[in-house]
Amino acid sequence: MAWQTPKTDWHGSTNSEGVYTGDRFNASDFNRIKNNLTFLRDMAINLYKEFSLVSLGDDRVPGDYFYADEINQLEENLETLNTNTLRMSYGSAPVYNDNGTTMDFKELNRLEGAILDLYDRLTNESEGRRTFTWNFGMKGGL
């Protein structure tokens, strides 16, 4: 699976009548976040000790519902990834409950911003590693 640039410009507002206008979270957004976390895990295990993320199954299709436990698992997978690698501070993730509050644009910006930051940092760490060519006397050395 390939890296997809996270959406970090989520926006929204609610008018005085309680009507929301702004970005909507859909199947492609869920898949992007889920798959980017898996991509980061695959990148991280080349630099850090082996660890695993909880699988969220197949990609979602339009019309699929997202449940509180799945959204919580995205947050937990981010926390697992962060804890096993760079240990950055990305704020505290809320816990979602069935028929309770849902992710808003602020939480989506925090989540996808953290994913992008980890990607940038892990990429820099991977590309910045020193590598040596060892010849062991092949060209008239000692």
Task: Give each language-model segment a name.
Residues 1-142:
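Extracellular "spike/adhesin" assembly and maturation modules
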